[in-house]
Amino acid sequence: MASEHLEHKLALLPDKPGCYLMKNINDQIIYVGKAKNLKNRVRSYFKSSHTGKVAKMVSEVADFETIVTSTNKESFLLEITLIQKHQPYFNIKLKKGTGYPYIKITNERDPQIKIVSKIKKDGGYYFGPYPNVYAAEETMHFIQKVYPLRRCNGYQGRPCLYYHMGQCLGACFKEVPKSDYEEQIKKIKSFLSGNTATVKRQLTKKMQRAAENMEFERAAEIRDQLHYIEVTVEKQKIISNDKTPRDLFNFYMDKGWLSIQIFFIRQARLMKREKRLFPIVDTAVEEMTSFILQFYNRRNNILPHEILLPKGLPNKEISEILGVPVRTPVRGEKRDLLAMAHENAQLSLDEKFRLLEMDQSKTTGAMKEITDALGLPEGHRIEAFDHSHIQGADPVSAMVVFINGEPAKNFYRKYKLKTVINHADEAASTREVIRRRYSRLLKENKPMPDMIFMDGGEIQMDAAKDVLENELGLEIPVVGMVKNDKHQTADLLFGDDDHHINLNPRSQGFYLVQRIQDEVHRFAITFHRRVHTKHSLSSRLDEIKGVGPRTRTKLLKKYGSITKIAQASVDEIHSLGINRPTAQLIKVSLQKNAEVAKGSSHD
């Protein structure tokens, strides 16, 4: 089940293609994926049941990020880059082997096209990466049919089979002019860059001609090639045409907040994305300019060879200060990348505002729902109390404080009850803790809470109201938090006759009551366990002859538990300033107790 934070972010996902980055509690990226529809894909992880590796991954997700792209093809290319960059644990299968395949045109007299796993500085032309070998082979086979180079092993004195099939220029039996290869390579590069109009026209004419000649199999084959172009070969804006290291900045401003996206382009690929969100006091241009200059100065980054910025910024001044070219692209893929960064900046800020609205509804909005239901003026501070004991032993009380719907742990308090000893008395426990808490606030002239919540029913409420009104002269609304037979938050008790106030169980007000009740119960139980454990240790040591308060304090301070004292040697106990006979008696007594406890555990 997704946390509240994740639920809120899931509700804000866009219906757009892109990549998503799953993060664990340490903010480490543990999985990178792509999706045609980010909203549907990311939500599916948390709205469906899973098994195995997927279930394990989902269980570790504490947060996620998304990067919107223009097409699904861009999503794939970005996914590959992000996986190679971050090496996420749950993408392990994608990382195995020799890496992602590329299509290469070799730097030879008679060049050929092949699939490789690494890029080398050998003068060849590389295209990709592709998601797998199959995808690369599909593209290579298409090129071999439409733009043939050399497909055989070279000169052999006779035409090869591929020459007869139209998939080889004939290096097998003749000297092919270099200009022929250069022309084909030019067409291949244009085609793989997304310029498909020319080849589509050519193939359409061939398909029509084949159909007219009743060559239906040939027409169907060409039809499949056209379909391949339409669904697979798109202009890949996420990849730059050259390998110049670039940083790209764009921003979006609304309601006094500035959202910045930074794309780091290296080796013709988007290697990294960073985002910043913060309120601003100056104009967007001034704040953005200051941010860019501080970004490189503070981080001590290695400057790229070029910085791309949106229009309206002082490019000349920034360039002079940083010492690198700063440009604003007006067309082509760089402009499209700027547009993508702007869209992501807007989405990030929209998400921020929606999350702030949701947080407000959970806190101050929830407080208003409660006060409205109780018929009280709007309040800000709630103090809640609960008691804890084991069959009356070691009774304690605890108080938690919520201000504007959020826990204020600095104001939490713990109480060891003094008037209730070795028996359970909810009314007496309530009277004591309420008296101690609010008589002190009166004495110190400190502000009172707007409401007091008691974990319990009429007994606790009546006791609290009696002390407040009749002993201290205070008028503070007292509300009871009632649980059902499943020990879950049910409703509230309030008013002179302690009548039930029903809150909508799906409302933020109800969730706040639930959080308060769970928190005060947790705090009381934790405190009681510590008190009871310490008391039990003291009791067991007090039973040993010769162990008084001073010796007991030495032992507990040094070892902290009966088990660790029992494991200590006589010499170690003696070294604390305890005489040897007593040290020996402590050792023997605790060992006997441990053996008895061990034996009884097997009964």
From Swiss-Prot:
Q: Which organism is it from?
A: Limosilactobacillus reuteri (strain DSM 20016) (Lactobacillus reuteri)
Task: Please describe what this protein does.
Answer: The UvrABC repair system catalyzes the recognition and processing of DNA lesions. UvrC both incises the 5' and 3' sides of the lesion. The N-terminal half is responsible for the 3' incision and the C-terminal half is responsible for the 5' incision.
- Domain of life of the organism in this record? Bacteria
User: Taking every annotated instance into account, which residue ranges of this chain make up the domain GIY-YIG?
Assistant: 15-92
Name the UniProt key words of this record, in alphabetical order: Cytoplasm, DNA damage, DNA excision, DNA repair, Excision nuclease, SOS response
Which GO biological process entries does UniProt record here? nucleotide-excision repair; SOS response
Protein name (record) = UvrABC system protein C
- What Gene Ontology cellular-component terms does the record carry? cytoplasm; excinuclease repair complex
GO molecular function terms here? DNA binding; excinuclease ABC activity
Q: How does it assemble?
A: Interacts with UvrB in an incision complex.
Q: What is its main location?
A: cytoplasm
* Family that this chain belongs to: Belongs to the UvrC family.
Q: Entry's Pfam families? A: GIY-YIG, HHH_5, UVR, UvrC_RNaseH, UvrC_RNaseH_dom
- InterPro entries in alphabetical order: GIY-YIG_endonuc, GIY-YIG_endonuc_sf, GIY-YIG_UvrC_Cho, RuvA_2-like, UVR_dom, UVR_dom_sf, UvrABC_protein_C, UvrC
* PROSITE patterns in alphabetical order: GIY_YIG, UVR, UVRC
Annotated UVR domain residues: 197-232
Q: List, alphabetically, the CDD domains matched.
A: GIY-YIG_UvrC_Cho
Q: Subcellular location, in the record's words?
A: Cytoplasm
